[in-house]
């Protein structure tokens, strides 16, 4: 009986906790629509500039993979300067650490480009922010 009560207490303690965040992207650029704060939650939602939207399963799986793929680079705190012709700057925070880069950074890793593409896709198609 005591064991059952302990198990029930452990299960209930986890109930009601919000799902963890996967990552936070802050994007800045020359026009108002370029400036964005996007928080992706493991619970299947994304918050763009303070407004929450549901995130479909495919995009959620993509976000989870991006988090895994970017973890080592975030742990290192990689900061790539913006290139001469760049427009958009990205700051990414996640549990593993943070990273910064620009859309025209030299020697930009493919994972950073995938994150930029994911951000553009979610911003336009989920959050309905046209750039």
Locate predicted features.
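Short, surface-exposed coil-to-beta transition loops
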Residues: 31-37, 85-87
């Amino acid at each position: 009986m005591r064991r059952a009560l302990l198990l029930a207490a452990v299960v209930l303690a986890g109930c009601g906790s919000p799902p963890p965040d996967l990552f936070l992207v802050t994007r800045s650029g020359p026009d108002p629509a370029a400036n964005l704060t996007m928080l992706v939650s493991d619970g299947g939602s994304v918050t763009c500039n303070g407004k929450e939207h549901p995130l479909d399963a495919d995009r959620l799986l993509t976000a989870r993979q991006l988090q895994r793929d970017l973890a080592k680079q975030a742990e290192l705190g990689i900061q790539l300067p913006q290139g001469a012709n760049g427009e958009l700057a990205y700051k990414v925070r996640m549990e593993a650490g943070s990273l910064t880069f620009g859309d025209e950074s030299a020697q930009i890793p493919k994972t950073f480009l995938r994150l930029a593409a994911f951000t553009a896709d979610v911003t336009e198609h989920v959050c309905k922010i046209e750039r």
